[in-house]
Structures are given as C-alpha cells and as structure tokens.
Amino acid sequence: MPNVVVVGAQWGDEGKGRVVDWLAAQADLVARYNGGHNAGHTLVVGGKTYKLALLPSGVVRGKRGVIGNGVALDPEALLAEIGRMAELGLSVTPDNLSIAENATLVLPIHRAIDQAQERLRREPIGTTLRGIGPAYEDKVGRRGLRVGDLAEPGRLAAKLDVLVDHHNAWFRGLGLDEYSRDAMLATLVDLAPRILPFVRPVWADLNDATDRGERILFEGSQAVMLDIDWGTYPFVTSSGTVASAAAAGTGLGASKLGHVLGVTKAYATRVGGGPFLTELSDATGETLRARGQEFGVNTGRPRRCGWLDAAQLRQAVRISGIDSLALTKLDVLDGFESIELCVGYEFDGARVDHLPASLDAQSRAKPVYERFDGWRGTVKGVRERAALPRAAQDFIARVEAVAGAPVSMITTGAERDDTIVLRNPFDAAAGA
C-alpha cells in the first residue's frame, strides 16, 4: 500500500513536523491518529509561521486533513487553532478537514483533574496539564463523551451526568470545588454547530481512499518511548504511539498502513520527568540545547539533552516495526571535537542491548558508549550523503547498524531544502 506512517522514535520533539511537511506535499490525505493538543510543532511556509497542535500538518500544504478516533479532541482548542489559521490566511473547513465521530472529547473538567493530579503526585510526571490523560481515562472507563454525541443533546446531557457525578465525588474527597454539569452542557451545545459539520465516518473515508490508490500520510504524535505500554512507564503519554496505533486510531486495517518511518534526532532530548540514560547535565548538554533551540513549542519548557541512544532506537525500531529512519538536526553536532553514541547498557554487571522495563532496573542501568571523531565546518546545505564529512558518514553508518534500520532521510539545517533523501518513503511503500 502506498501509505506512510510517521512515528517519533525517541521521546518526542524529533522533528516529525518537518518530515511530515516534506512528505505531505506528495500525499493526498494527512491523518492524525493519536494524542491531543499536548504536543505541537511549527511549520514555516511561504514566510508564514504556523503553530499546530491538533490540525494535521497537511492542511498547510492544501491537503485534506483527518483527525482520527484515536485523538483526544478539545473542541475549544481546535476552534481556536482554526481561528489562528484563518488569521494567517489559511481556511480550514469541512472541505479540507474531517473529524472521526468516535473521537474522545477533552472537557474543561479534564483540565482541572489533570492539574489536581499533578499537584498531588509525589513525583510529577511533567504532563502539559491540558486534560489529555484524564480524557483517555474516561474513554477507557466507558464514561467518556465522543464527538458524535454533540449531535444528540439529550444523550449528551445524560452521559455528562455520569461523567460529572463520577469526578465530583473525587473533587469532594479532596475538598475541591465541584464542577457544574449545566455549565459544561451549555458550552458543548454552543460549540456543537461549529464542530459537527466536520464530523465524518473517517474509517470508511480512509478505506475508500486506499482502495482508490490514494496516498495517505499518518502523522504520529509524541513517540515510541512515550507509548502507554512500551514507554518508560509511568512517565509516558496516555495513548498508543507505536505505528500500530495508526490502525487502531483511524480504522484503516494494519495491513494497509504501508511504510513506517521513524524520526530521530542525531542526539536525544526529553521533556519532563522519567529515565533518560544518556542525559548530559553539563556544558555539552547546554550546548546541544542552545544549538538545537530545544524548548517546547506549546509550553516553552527547556528540554533535557544528551547523546543519541542507538540501543533505545533499536528497541523502538523493533517494537514499532520501523522500516527506515529520518535522522534530523545533524547540523547541531557540527564542531564537536568528539561525539558519543550509546550502543547498549551495563546492568548489574552484565551487558544488555535493551532498556529494562522497570524504573528501578532502569535506574541501575548505565549507558555503554562508542566515541566518534567530530567534524569541522558544517553539514548545512549538503544535499548528498556522500558529500557529508567522513566522520559524519561513519557516525550515521554506526547508527544504522546498531538500530537495525537504514536511514532514508537526513536533515542538515533549518530550511526545508536542507534535506538529504536517500529513498523516498512513499516510493518504498509502493515497492518502487
């Protein structure tokens, strides 16, 4: 199938937006399948800066966008984002955006719960406090509201009763103010006429598009190591972030997903708490942060920085079925005298090639590094792998060998054209 799934292969912020933007020009549809407005990215197109959190990146390139059922949708946040796009001259309408009728709604009460839970934790997870986790909790608890419920005010009110009663018992137990069901219902009834025109049976649309041979680009949020099952639990997000989540989160069968492209920086970053074995809390880490401008798009939070963990990358490749890698921000490594690459771990006196599952075990694991010579000058503007400095080529080759996947794309600068394409993922998906 000529489709491509883009997943983050680390802890997020790998540059997926940049890669998706490049691929979107070749796609017919771009579909979001997980997460919510807790992760964002910035695109610069035609001299205009677009900051996206819920909208699929393809709408900026004039492509049809899809928000799948796996997304936790805050209707107020979506409408605000559509409004910001309008101010930039980009019209988002039901003609170029569809929303799955069974996508979960994020409500004001979820944000309040998120904030209260984070305050109460002995060790904060580092959530963005936007209500995504509590919304997914309600989804799994079978009391969540879905986008399609907006079309049935009577049913909406009854479901909201169940949800609010459940959470108000928790608020009362903590001595916190209870939430008004009537106020939330009034807000949702007011929002419904602006959301419902976008609602479609997305699963059917995507299957029909695939049958017609159209190219679908699946745009993942967060990353493999933040997956609710496979990430560094409990310091994870609340949804599936591996490639198989694209099937569950849109309704297109797994056999139709096509090529899986994992995106990784040439170094590593992480936001919030949780294990990060190659983290650098020294001048080198500060240099990576400054050169890479490692601050959150939505939150402005500084990201933790460290050397690339190719052993972790191998784990992501195997768990998510990654066919090839996009290696981003290679230029950030310009000028380092030497570069280190984690190729495994030492754990209780033994060498292991994967990250243990438990937090206690992870705290005892130590990275095993290989050192590479750095390179002088810059890789910016280089358009072919063979034209990269020999030291950079050696580093990339070792990343491929340890991770167990070929590098198909390399970004060497901030401009869209600063991209080396070794094999187009859409061509790979089509078997070309």
UniProtKB/Swiss-Prot annotation:
SMART domains per the UniProt record, alphabetical: Adenylsucc_synt
Origin superkingdom: Bacteria
Annotated residues for binding of IMP: D13, E14, G15, K16, N38, A39, G40, H41, T128, R142, Q222, T237, R301
EC identifiers of the protein: 6.3.4.4
UniProt-annotated binding residues for substrate: V297, N298, T299, G300, R301, P302, R303
Cofactor: binding details: Binds 1 Mg(2+) ion per subunit.
Cofactor(s) the record lists: Mg(2+)
UniProt entry tagged with the keyword Amino-acid biosynthesis: no
Keyword field contains Metal-binding: yes
Gene Ontology terms: biological process: 'de novo' AMP biosynthetic process; IMP metabolic process
Transmembrane segments: none
Location of this chain's protein in the cell: Cytoplasm
Class of the enzyme per the UniProt entry, highest EC level: ligase
CC annotations in GO: cytoplasm
Keywords, sorted A to Z: Cytoplasm, GTP-binding, Ligase, Magnesium, Metal-binding, Nucleotide-binding, Purine biosynthesis
Positions bound to Mg(2+): D13, G40
Chain sites annotated for binding GTP: 12-18, 40-42, 303, 329-331, 411-413
One Gene Ontology molecular-function label: magnesium ion binding
Pfam families with a match to the protein in the record: Adenylsucc_synt (PF00709)
Catalyses which reaction(s): IMP + L-aspartate + GTP = N(6)-(1,2-dicarboxyethyl)-AMP + GDP + phosphate + 2 H(+)
Residues at the catalytic site: D13, H41
Chief location bin: cytoplasm
Subunit composition and interactions: Homodimer.
Role: Plays an important role in the de novo pathway of purine nucleotide biosynthesis. Catalyzes the first committed step in the biosynthesis of AMP from IMP.
NCBIfam families tied to this protein: PRK01117.1, purA
Name the UniProt record assigns to this protein: Adenylosuccinate synthetase 2
Biological source species: Burkholderia lata (strain ATCC 17760 / DSM 23089 / LMG 22485 / NCIMB 9086 / R18194 / 383)
Highest classification ranks of the organism: Bacteria, Pseudomonadati, Pseudomonadota, Betaproteobacteria, Burkholderiales
